[in-house]
Amino acid sequence: MSKYRSPKTKKSIQATLQFKSTPTLVKCPKCSITYSTNSPSDLVQHKRYHDLHLNGKRWSQSWGDIINRVEALKTEKQLKYSMVSEKDKKVMSFQLPSQTLYEEDEYIVMISPKKANEVKAALDLMSIVNEELNAPHDENAFWSEVDKSGKSQGKAFIYVKKNRAVGVITIEYIENTNRGKWMVLDTKAIVPNVVPDVKLGISRIWVCRNQRQHGIATRLLEVARKKSIYGCIVNKWELAWSQPSQSGSILAKSYNAAKHRSGKLLIPCYI
């Protein structure tokens, strides 16, 4: 008797087609970075970038030497007190002299090029600044390094508020270099054959987005002209700009622009 083998039943396999998702690019309305919502690395990068550009870099109290504290806002210059005299039952008023109060968590520090930790922290901050300003990332040696004599060619000042670096200015020494020029503010044209005797050059100045319009940039400028050269306070017009951005031009106009007899506004710059 012959045996018949039943044919084996083939298992069906479900085919799955995998399509790569099309990257969806969006631009953050607050920090202005463009990133892909489908990319995990982009999402992480945006989160970091967003926080740094809006709120500044977290800053250790051990970084930098405090050279200026920000005065607290006072509603009254003097405090009035009154008391009742036991002798004649009259109310007598007197005033205490006003005292300068300072914010405990708001100050400006100067970076020492000889202290590696604070230099690294400042360089990390400058990376953020240069990204936003679309500026070169290799122009930090003048304040972050020292020459053979142990001196630097500039200064970096950081504005710290609530344990975050929310502003920075880097200053280059340009005294006796003939690099000073006058720039026509509205056209960016350089005035020929005139060399102002400028002493300091503003390489970078930046304030994080959430702290703008609070006078921080002006405070940084004031500290720079008073503290960059030991024992010397330079005049405002001796503080020169380097290719100011649109917002930088507005700041320059209010801080140290000079009106020419032609009616044009000029700002000191250096090249």
Curated annotation (Swiss-Prot):
Family annotation (PROSITE patterns): GNAT
GO MF annotations, alphabetized: protein-lysine-acetyltransferase activity; zinc ion binding
Any one GO cellular component localisation term in the record: nucleus
Alphabetized UniProt keyword annotations: Acyltransferase, Cell cycle, Metal-binding, Nucleus, Transferase, Zinc, Zinc-finger
InterPro entries on file: AcTrfase_ESCO_Znf_dom, Acyl_CoA_acyltransferase, ESCO_Acetyltransf_dom, GNAT_dom
Zinc finger (CCHH-type): 26-50
Subcellular location: Nucleus
Record keyword Metal-binding present: yes
GO biological process: mitotic sister chromatid cohesion
Domain of life: Eukaryota
Ranges of residues in domain N-acetyltransferase: 109-271
Family from the record: Belongs to the acetyltransferase family. ECO subfamily.
Function recorded in the entry: Probable acetyltransferase required for the establishment of sister chromatid cohesion and couple the processes of cohesion and DNA replication to ensure that only sister chromatids become paired together. In contrast to the structural cohesins, the deposition and establishment factors are required only during S phase. Acts by acetylating the cohesin complex component SMC3.
Name under which the protein is recorded: N-acetyltransferase ECO1
Organism: Kluyveromyces lactis (strain ATCC 8585 / CBS 2359 / DSM 70799 / NBRC 1267 / NRRL Y-1140 / WM37) (Yeast)
Gene: ECO1
